[in-house]
């Protein structure tokens, strides 16, 4: 009996050798900071700034997904919650390619949101077995997919493009696989600005077709993600399906600002100090 008990106990670590949650594929999302800031509410001071050195397209995240369009989130991971100390060795590069566009929030708040919600779930795959591995692999994906280069034939430009133009421009980048893209609405001009590109990847990070619901071929089914101001992390404007025509890819120089993305603005630091007075 004792031997049987010991054997059973020895099996426990094997049964729970991986954190995370099983999933079907990954979705890599890159955003166009110019569109995000142009679509942001300009009436709020310092509400959106593009840090100096930010690439034309930057990282939003890498998300485990199920084939039906739903996705796991906030899984058991190692660590369960984001620990900045574990990614110090790559932080200088992360600040550039995975920037915070909202100076009232720290850059770490964006990384924390993405890791806690999505990175922990990816740990069911050995490739993402640690926090450092997750962020490292996401940057590798970003480096291997040249969205900005693929879009050179259509923009940036103040002239509108069509969804067909966009698909044709990125066909080489995506190896002909279907992908998703979403727009943001410019509050002033009411134009639809190309806000993000979402590519679907196999677990080995090779590109695959994205599943669709048939009615809206540029997005997954009824579980489409909403990235609004009521979410944790930087308050990105709400993304929506792009129209078939009159999609704009505005010039980056028209909105860029110099900003230190590693820390909050003066307003943010003052607010933090006020909150800590009673603690």
UniProtKB/Swiss-Prot annotation:
- What EC number(s) would the UniProt record show? 4.6.1.19
Q: Name one GO molecular function term.
A: RNA binding
- Enzyme's top EC category: lyase
Q: Which UniProt keywords apply?
A: Disulfide bond, Endonuclease, Glycoprotein, Hydrolase, Lyase, Lysosome, Nuclease, Signal
Q: Which residues form the signal peptide?
A: 1-17
Tissue specificity, in the record's words, reads: Expressed in the pharynx, hypodermis, muscle cells, sheath cells, intestinal cells, the vulva and tail regions.
Entry-linked InterPro entries: Ribonuclease_T2_eukaryotic, RNase_T2-like, RNase_T2-like_sf, RNase_T2_His_AS_1, RNase_T2_His_AS_2
Tell where it localizes: Lysosome
Does Lyase show up as a keyword for this record? yes
Pfam families (alphabetical): Ribonuclease_T2 (PF00445)
Q: Which residues participate directly in catalysis?
A: 60, 114, 118
Reaction(s) catalysed (UniProt annotation): a ribonucleotidyl-ribonucleotide-RNA + H2O = a 3'-end 3'-phospho-ribonucleotide-RNA + a 5'-end dephospho-ribonucleoside-RNA + H(+)
Cystine pairings recorded for this chain:
37-48, 200-210
Q: What Gene Ontology biological process does one annotation of this record name?
A: RNA catabolic process
What does it do? Probable endoribonuclease involved in the autophagy-mediated degradation of ribosomal RNA and ribosomal proteins in lysosomes.
By sequence similarity, the record places it as follows: Belongs to the RNase T2 family.
Q: Which PANTHER family match?
A: RIBONUCLEASE T2
What name has this protein been given in UniProt? Ribonuclease T2 protein rnst-2
Q: Which gene encodes it?
A: rnst-2
